[in-house]
Amino acid sequence: MAQGSGGREGALRTPAGGWHSPPSPDMQELLRSVERDLSIDPRQLAPAPGGTHVVALVPARWLASLRDRRLPLGPCPRAEGLGEAEVRTLLQRSVQRLPAGWTRVEVHGLRKRRLSYPLGGGLPFEDGSCGPETLTRFMQEVAAQNYRNLWRHAYHTYGQPYSHSPAPSAVPALDSVRQALQRVYGCSFLPVGETTQCPSYAREGPCPPRGSPACPSLLRAEALLESPEMLYVVHPYVQFSLHDVVTFSPAKLTNSQAKVLFILFRVLRAMDACHRQGLACGALSLYHIAVDEKLCSELRLDLSAYERPEEDENEEAPVARDEAGIVSQEEQGGQPGQPTGQEELRSLVLDWVHGRISNFHYLMQLNRLAGRRQGDPNYHPVLPWVVDFTTPHGRFRDLRKSKFRLNKGDKQLDFTYEMTRQAFVAGGAGGGEPPHVPHHISDVLSDITYYVYKARRTPRSVLCGHVRAQWEPHEYPASMERMQNWTPDECIPEFYTDPSIFRSIHPDMPDLDVPAWCSSSQEFVAAHRALLESREVSRDLHHWIDLTFGYKLQGKEAVKEKNVCLHLVDAHTHLASYGVVQLFDQPHPQRLAGAPALAPEPPLIPKLLVQTIQETTGREDFTENPGQLPNGVGRPVLEATPCEASWTRDRPVAGEDDLEQATEALDSISLAGKAGDQLGSSSQASPGLLSFSVASASRPGRRNKAAGADPGEGEEGRILLPEGFNPMQALEELEKTGNFLAKGLGGLLEVPEQPRVQPAVPLQCLLHRDMQALGVLLAEMVFATRVRTLQPDAPLWVRFQAVRGLCTRHPKEVPVSLQPVLDTLLQMSGPEVPMGAERGKLDQLFEYRPVSQGLPPPCPSQLLSPFSSVVPFPPYFPALHRFILLYQARRVEDEAQGRELVFALWQQLGAVLKDITPEGLEILLPFVLSLMSEEHTAVYTAWYLFEPVAKALGPKNANKYLLKPLIGAYESPCQLHGRFYLYTDCFVAQLMVRLGLQAFLTHLLPHVLQVLAGAEASQEESKDLAGAAEEEESGLPGAGPGSCAFGEEIPMDGEPPASSGLGLPDYTSGVSFHDQADLPETEDFQAGLYVTESPQPQEAEAVSLGRLSDKSSTSETSLGEERAPDEGGAPVDKSSLRSGDSSQDLKQSEGSEEEEEEEDSCVVLEEEEGEQEEVTGASELTLSDTVLSMETVVAGGSGGDGEEEEEALPEQSEGKEQKILLDTACKMVRWLSAKLGPTVASRHVARNLLRLLTSCYVGPTRQQFTVSSGESPPLSAGNIYQKRPVLGDIVSGPVLSCLLHIARLYGEPVLTYQYLPYISYLVAPGSASGPSRLNSRKEAGLLAAVTLTQKIIVYLSDTTLMDILPRISHEVLLPVLSFLTSLVTGFPSGAQARTILCVKTISLIALICLRIGQEMVQQHLSEPVATFFQVFSQLHELRQQDLKLDPAGRGEGQLPQVVFSDGQQRPVDPALLDELQKVFTLEMAYTIYVPFSCLLGDIIRKIIPNHELVGELAALYLESISPSSRNPASVEPTMPGTGPEWDPHGGGCPQDDGHSGTFGSVLVGNRIQIPNDSRPENPGPLGPISGVGGGGLGSGSDDNALKQELPRSVHGLSGNWLAYWQYEIGVSQQDAHFHFHQIRLQSFPGHSGAVKCVAPLSSEDFFLSGSKDRTVRLWPLYNYGDGTSETAPRLVYTQHRKSVFFVGQLEAPQHVVSCDGAVHVWDPFTGKTLRTVEPLDSRVPLTAVAVMPAPHTSITMASSDSTLRFVDCRKPGLQHEFRLGGGLNPGLVRALAISPSGRSVVAGFSSGFMVLLDTRTGLVLRGWPAHEGDILQIKAVEGSVLVSSSSDHSLTVWKELEQKPTHHYKSASDPIHTFDLYGSEVVTGTVSNKIGVCSLLEPPSQATTKLSSENFRGTLTSLALLPTKRHLLLGSDNGVIRLLA
């Protein structure tokens, strides 16, 4: 390049910056052809990185017409709306989001003229070979092939030279390729280009329809096109290739050989399909294998390998060099693509080290090798900043530190690293995925930085899309100084080459300022480039290379240099096409800038040093012309010139540091100019100074301060070397360079000469080359990090030589599974074949031997055969492959197709899971997850596939991977059809078993219950369920144990946010669902509180909740004190809950249930509540029950109304589907409530239902009155009290039905101790002074509270109602009325919500009045009633003061105070008057006055001061609708009948009948009239209530009853159960401690001998016990009676012959394992024995047994000869056996424990010795003397923790591989012979009947309780804990088991 600045500028003006290499001639030709033949705008085309094809940006419609084979193909439309820069960005690989309607395709081209050679050999395979392969056939084919190959080999060697037979027929390669492509891709070529009449079309006629491609593992072709000169294959764009996986996401394949083999399996399938059709795949590389997130690989053929190079093109033009041997810039720029053969990295490194190429050129080549792409915003080439612009004259930047480190400072990087390290450790300990990985640097050059750098040249739209959405041109750095200061990232090449980057294209953004020491951008670029080439930089550049591309990116060096990059250490498994790439793993050699270290002349002695420096100081001045700056590229000015002395040491001797630093950079520029002139003189002046100043160990270019001292002052005799001189340096550098070249770059490549000429190319030769390319590709995958330094377009033979060398040098790095296949494909064991570049492009690398190890040369079908041992493909691969192909083949448009697909997959899943390993599950799982998260398949996938997949995964992984998609399936409202499957009790039982009870209750149950609140519930409302828990937990104080008060159970379980711990991090990163679902879930939970996102702006719930705790807590305790004495004595408690024959009923119902269970194929033991059905004769719940139970109690209408409403139902619900869905869900909730028992049902089911009830009323739509066909509009004239349900009442029907069912099941305490306190919490005002502000959720809470109170009042007995009446008045009615009648509180939904609340409250108060009678109303309810009526007077007065009030109210900031006639002053919000007047109208006055005047009679005058005013208003209303009506106020209401009729305590009195509470039918005018036909004919003691059953709230008329009795249930709470339940619902779920109160709950007598072992089933509703009486019994854990009742076993297993000492459950298949010296496996549903394992020798019995955790199905048995044996239930015989003794005599194995992961087993011996064994390998990990006595029991806990107890009275906690115990507990009196674990606590039992609780984490401290003889008789023999229910099962030596809490 010319030296002048003009020439440089010319070169820099090229649009791409002038420094990156242009495309090769072949690529330019392909680009021109595609532009010409396909009419695609050249701006929409880009060469692919590998140089094999063109990427085109095309409209999707154009591509569709191409796919549909429409001819003629029109020109491709241009990207009109997009600028050139945007189009260029969209063509970059790392960009994934494209504008709508646009897509990218790959166009692969073949030049016809290069296919003119003959191609010999036909199809190598017969098509008939597609039947199932058998061993016989495989052997026959191998023998035939061997025979054929040996014959041919012999013929070629001995026969052919003498044979004169004609040459075998050969076809032109063009025809052969064209036909093979059509067969493989299943479509024919379309003519394109200038003449669409290609010769082949004349013959073939019109285009046939598209067929199917030969193999699904082959990348499909969108179209095959033919122009006169070219053949094109158009492929869909490949986003990620296998090269991206091994380069940027290597963790995707680590630790799993199955994944690598599966990719190979699919590639071989594709190659086999191509070879069968006679098509060679070409010189395959990692770039040719397309991979998606689920690791489904597709092969993309390398068609260019078919092209034979033309003769003239074969000769490469030699690179011109000038005399000094340096490649000049012009040649470098013009030489296409830097030809790989000549410029291999080795020579590149040497050229740079010796100064033959410039720094810039070398760094650009390193960028290219790392895959960095010009113009890619995410992966642009990166160069170092070399100058610090922040100082006035600039100074050199420290290249030993990364820019990130210089910018952020060491402190911040250390802080980042330490914080992420701590988070990583904490995350790892928690067992979930580590949230953070310790790192210092997040990115080297981010896309934001790239766009900011290029902001002046980038269109505004792009900047707004990437940098910041708002256009703020002045926010972008305005100068180089600010730019460099702002960014932690490195520089880009444009700042060294392109002056245009400084000039702005935006009118409102100024140009980028250059530093003050430059006058223009051209001058700056020239100076900047010169600085890059300066010797200061050259000498330190290798440090920067080590930091950016080299060994300092990983390991200890990276930590030391604070250079740990997140991308390299985060082990991410999502695919990426950019990242940080490490090229070198050895220290990079230093550039030998200046004179060599070993100079021809000796160095000067130190005495002269000071003198020389002082002499040279005066000789320096800055008189040079800065215009003569060399560009430092064209010649070796800076690198090889020995001029260092003239400036490096030109430094002030004193400490003038600032000046010294500030002038550094400028010095180097000015001095570089005269370097050439001083070449001779300066080196003669001080020859020795040069040689050691270069190698100075101090900061480059800076002299050591100590050099100023006189070194000659020391001892005379010692030889003093010059400062910084190292005589060994030259040798060390030589060693370093050699080491780097040998280890880092893989040694030398020899290129022997071997010319060859071959006429026709046999097809077999091409196919063999394919196999060799496959071998090279596999080796490149294995050695991915070592072959990064190969060029992407390196020829096959270069790649082969490289990988062959690597395989020889590093054989241990090749995985065992790939060693045989690499050896077969690359003939590693054979002699090394010398080969050269001139070997033809079409030749194979070497010839395979005709027979090798008995097999013919490798081909895909041979490698795929199950009978060939070359590749060890697991046996499940074919089934897995078929499963995936079926998944990919079906396109699902609707639900029917979705169901068909899932059903078909389900049929295949069994074959896949039969032999699958965990590695295989990793491949399968992403497909199942994406099915579970796609709309049309989610429900059916859950129904069909959840059970088998979760069974294979085990509970831990099922929670980790399947929980989130399950939540998605439950939350998706559009999935109505078939959704009821997910709510069947059978499916929910599977969920509980496979996820684990606790995980199901905590994470999934809230989402399951959501459906009850209506399918149309919005996402926000439904998510409130999860969040409300936290609000309530934070808003209310937890009541202490023992207090049974309103509100005590409100502290809800502190469930973690649904998203925490449920992320799906690992192999599922391909599933799109999770990426979307993560966002809202995580965002909604801020600081543990749920922030609602509703359409209207509203207060966060937490605001009012915080305030409401003060008031409610005081009332809670006071109520508890009053109520407590009643607990035992209330009549409901004992007498009514136990029917005499309930046990008889139970037996009958249990029998029928078991049949149902078997029909339902349920996997779980369950006990439906048949008992209640027997007792109460209830019917099933139907939807009509649920919907009609919504009406307000004081409602009615005639029977006709009810019928009309039933007819209107289908319109109200969403038809039959919705009805089935709600029916199924209600039935399931009823079943679940009984199954879970009272405490768990109250904590999890009831609490969630109560929260749901509020969401049923949220939003204005739910607050509309429902108008059925025959009904008048709201509050119409005439018949005032009608059925007035709002939509929310209909929606809340199923929720109320389920809530009342729980009350029926467990009795009245549920209403008074759980529901009423929750109601008082809902309605409590937010602060002590007056009502709080309402938000829409609080408003809905008020409506829900009043509705639920109404339901509860009906079911309360008279005594209970009277007991809690004061509380209802003060804690429910008055707070509701304070909101309703408030003059300052507005309702978010305005008058509508207030009107509904008003109507509901009237109904509620009227209901209570009817229940308690006039006297009690006067005594207890006068205040609420008076408050209600008072509001009319207040509004009346306000209306009169209206004029005076308004101006005052508007003027002040605070609310005006108004004095009312009662003398009180109240604040009034003038803005609310309108709302209040809309609600409290004349009509409302009439609505209130008439019923209360009837109900209260004369008392109304005593308790309602303003009754006359309200009466007048009511009269006005009557006049307005019918002027002739009488004034009701003037007429005394006449009471019907006599007093006793209103006596609430009467037996069968009228209020029990269906109509007495329904004013619509009873009010005639203003009289209450009881219709004759409504009286029951024979009302018994239960009256009409007997019809009300477990189904729902019965019929509509029952629903209007004033009082209904709760039916007696065998599960009703009384006695100890009631006391324990009251305590338990008040305890916070956050409490992780186990509290033992010795409350006796149930007894299980039946064993005739001592109970040896007890084991609860995982669902905690049944448990197993084994005894000395040789039986195993299965017991139900449902609550009965008051704590004194006894329960009979459900099943007795009697097949044992000796005493049973072990019983447990195999979780995966749900079988029971019990042992009496022989192991029995049996079915708990039927009691049938499935398998018996007898000891091999009766003299060596089994002494200990343990079952492996799910998903394993093995049993581990220890025999008395210290041998461990493993049995798999699915297979006959033993799996394997391991010896434990090992020469010692540790005694008998007493106890076995298996770690929760199943990876290790620990055995405890009678001698106190313990042995830890790896279950996978059988290796003994550790053996140690743990105790001094017999080991009694061992348990293994998560986190590799073991707990052991011994007869030496100790209990010890161990870490698996640590020598010392972490905790040691000593029991004083007796040894701990039995214990169980609760979280991080151990619950222990001793022979002296003491129960202790001690912690695994905290220092030893133990709380012990002695069991009282009243609660536990006999001696404690065994103990088991129910973790969810928090109960203890204690077995005794007298055969009785007791349940205590």
Curated annotation (Swiss-Prot):
Q: Name the segments for region: Necessary and sufficient for the interaction with SQSTM1.
A: 1-650
Q: Which Gene3D superfamilies match?
A: BEACH domain, YVTN repeat-like/Quinoprotein amine dehydrogenase
Q: Single GO molecular-function term?
A: K63-linked polyubiquitin modification-dependent protein binding
Record localization: Early endosome membrane; Late endosome membrane; Lysosome membrane; Cytoplasmic vesicle, Autophagosome membrane
**Membrane spanning stretches:** none
- The residue ranges flagged as biased composition, category Polar residues, are 1137-1146
Q: What is its main location?
A: membrane
So which tissues is this one expressed in? Widely expressed. In the brain, highest levels in cerebellum and corpus callosum.
What top-level branch of life does the organism fall under? Eukaryota
Q: Does the keyword Mitochondrion apply?
A: yes
- Where is the segment annotated Disordered? 1-27, 618-637, 694-718, 1022-1074, 1097-1217, 1523-1556, 1569-1602
According to the UniProt entry, the coiled-coil residues are none
BEACH domain mapped to chain residues? 337-614
The observed outcome of changing L547A is: Loss of interaction with MAP1LC3C
Q: Per UniProt, which keywords does this protein have? A: Cytoplasm, Cytoplasmic vesicle, Disease variant, Endosome, Intellectual disability, Lysosome, Membrane, Mitochondrion, Repeat, Transit peptide, WD repeat
How this chain sits in the membrane, per its record, is:
Peripheral membrane protein
Cellular component GO terms, alphabetically?
autophagosome membrane; cytosol; early endosome membrane; endosome membrane; late endosome membrane; lysosomal membrane; mitochondrion
Q: Short name of one Pfam family for this protein?
A: WD40
What spans are recorded as compositionally biased (Gly residues)?
A: 1586-1595
Positions of WD repeats: 1639-1677, 1686-1724, 1729-1769, 1777-1815, 1819-1856, 1860-1896, 1902-1941
The UniProt regions of compositional bias labelled Acidic residues, in chain numbering, are 1151-1174
GO BP of this protein: aggrephagy; early endosome to late endosome transport; mitochondrion organization; protein stabilization; ubiquitin-dependent protein catabolic process
Subunit details: Interacts with WDR91; involved in early to late endosome cargo transport. Interacts with BECN1; negatively regulates the PI3 kinase/PI3K activity associated with endosomal membranes. Interacts with SQSTM1; the interaction is direct and regulates the interaction of SQSTM1 with ubiquitinated proteins. Interacts with MAP1LC3C; recruits MAP1LC3C to ubiquitinated protein aggregates in the aggrephagy process.
The family annotation for this protein states: Belongs to the WD repeat WDR81 family.
Q: What does this protein do?
A: Functions as a negative regulator of the PI3 kinase/PI3K activity associated with endosomal membranes via BECN1, a core subunit of the PI3K complex. By modifying the phosphatidylinositol 3-phosphate/PtdInsP3 content of endosomal membranes may regulate endosome fusion, recycling, sorting and early to late endosome transport. It is for instance, required for the delivery of cargos like BST2/tetherin from early to late endosome and thereby participates indirectly to their degradation by the lysosome.
Task: Return the protein name.
Answer: WD repeat-containing protein 81
Gene name of this polypeptide: WDR81
